């Protein structure tokens, strides 16, 4: 079975597009081959800045012959019907078969579609793939109609086996497929022929091209950390930058340079961001001082002077970039010292947050008031929380954040310290944006928590108020992320703040003049939205959706910390034998009771009387229910849900014995009513802990 090698050679492909392009090439080609009837053993996709490559092993040499039988009209059907059948099959009358079935003689057409050779199918699939390739952006060049991310220069398409290799014949917009490629643009630009994937990969290596992006990443990181270690330094990890740089070079050459002394006083985040965004440099720190003192750059070629000229040029460009950063830093510090952070924030009055939600200054005023209300609920000083909220977004007007928006919050914390504000306020300037995602750090300082909650809840309340809610996959204002942030802030800090109590004042601050709206529906919708995000969060931790629903049905479900404690205890309980068996007993009791109440048109909730107990099983269940009630109440009061579940578990054996020996629907009406009331007691006792009717199974 032959192996297939495809290389699409072009001008430089943007690094950010390469990983997706590899997967798209693999999927489009292999899916197309399979749809055409070919099979294969394995496939792998690779990329460098100038080439997309696909290797398919164990490809079948041709597609199978397909035989299709189609049933037609009766043999004595009108001529028009038979003619229509012939047209649909492409056969003549003499090629039809006549077979007997229950309805008599029927015409059948047997259509055989011969297999096609692999080269023909590959050419067809590859042309379709190239013409329909889903680049985020593409271009045309010259006079052709072909579109590609950058001008496509050559196509290598080769089928090879033990007998040799053959070029797949195809021509596309003047490009004819061949068996040759180029090496490194500068170090080995000559073309060379290949006979298969292993030969291709080996010759590329000798031509200074490292084909596998993951190998380039490993080589870059290994060499960078080795050079840093030799000087007692450490490279700051940056997985995204490493992936991007690996997509910029075919033959990585790691070089380390020094940062000018004039710039070492800049905040490390500024140095790292400037070097990463503008130069694609890695930052290198001195563990002894904690400062970023050097940088690592990755060249795409070896040079006779071992990179000295490259480092010199990079150093000049870096100095210019860092001079700009230093200017921004010093200019911002002067503003802070003369006008303070609140003075810096004055410009936010002219910055629109949303045309229906006011300016950034309006938003800050709402967050300040809300942070003051939330502060006591999370153990923070109301005055400090209000002060932090007032200045937390001041750095949005700074020159540094204007140049590097990703430093918002970080620069605010530096400027707050420069202004002499309390450390809790400085920390809140940075931390109030967190958490930004499911794995981001969660603030724990009370002032930071208060401002972070106020920021996110104001955003949610505002957009909910104006009807800008997430729909399907669309969430332009990142409201799902904001809701998850609120959830993680409350849970991580074990906060007992009730969402309903926070959301109402947040909604009220979005009142427009003469607005008399009832916010209750908005609050309930928003609380339901929080519950949906909480379900996703807890499912990722292994808690089933029905367990969460059983706890959501209980009072106080806007206290997320209490809700999660209950869900965790119930989840653990249901994984035990006692939990599983009690659930079955509860469901049996609930089903019998529900059916009886529907049939009789009454509710059996008047309390069972022990004096009507006729059997030991009934008397034992009475005693067990009394004991459970006495234990569950204090346990729930203490929020010890594990103890409440344990008390509920003690009902398992008495309930089992009751159903084994007692007929609930007795002929005696008094006994029947008493026993149904007892089933209600079982349901009511369990319902104090969780709504078990929502549990599946």
Curated annotation (Swiss-Prot):
It is found in: Cytoplasm. InterPro entries: DALR_anticod-bd, Gly-tRNA-synth_bsu, Gly-tRNA-synth_heterodimer. It catalyses: tRNA(Gly) + glycine + ATP = glycyl-tRNA(Gly) + AMP + diphosphate. The keyword Ion transport does not apply. One of its GO terms (molecular function) is ATP binding. GO terms for cellular component: cytosol. HAMAP family: Gly_tRNA_synth_beta (MF_00255). This is Glycine--tRNA ligase beta subunit. It comes from Cereibacter sphaeroides (strain ATCC 17029 / ATH 2.4.9).
